[in-house]
């Protein structure tokens, strides 16, 4: 039985230090191994070998800590990503987006609920001011000061821009949706199969964030290699051709066939 991780539900401030960082994330998963995710040895190696270019030791430490939480914390993900060196950029950005959603509940709500609701409500833009007010609403326990909420708003919008959900870095920012390659969707489905999360495999903030809901999910899943889904009313049945995410990557390499 594949070990199952759980999406993170406790709010934290890691996003204030490390946003999406798709290029650095790729450098991490190409070089890191599951057995090297404890202690400072990997941090030292990343610094000496310039995994992330000419970064300071504190910055390398922050990146490694973030990427461990986003990728290494989910069984099989790091091995699967290491086995997919020729991943296209569109897929890589989405993989980083979904892993950030899994590991950060505020980013998950922002991209999977708040931005979705704005689109559905006919609002075509988003600005920093309304995002700050939204953060104040969801921070019902008063964890963060006004200045911290303002920092969160900037970082959320920056990450959303990098992921393809907003078109610019200046207000008002037009809402957009990234293209979802079949290989990216296949990765997400096999990943979620081994994760405990709120929702179902066909209805969740990970799919909603990229504009996939209802029949659009069914249509897109037909293009994904290595799995099939039959839905009858509210009942869905998945057929998985591979035992794990890593097996799926090794057999399909994100194929759209």
Feature annotation, model-predicted:
Residues 28, 32, 94-124, 181-200:
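Positively charged, polyanion-binding regions of nucleic-acid-associated proteins
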Residues 161-171, 225-231:
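A short, conserved structural fragment
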Residues 225-226, 231-257:
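Long, low-complexity, charge-rich intrinsically disordered regions
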Residues 1-102, 113-114, 126, 257:
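Eukaryotic partner-binding/assembly regions in large regulatory complexes
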Residues 125-142:
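DNA-recognition alpha helix
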Residues 55-62, 146-162, 210-223:
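Short amphipathic alpha-helical interaction segments
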Residues 90, 98, 174-213, 244-257:
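Short, amphipathic alpha-helical interaction segments positioned at domain boundaries
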Residues 121, 138-147, 170:
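Inter-helical turn/loop segments and adjacent helix faces that build the functional surface
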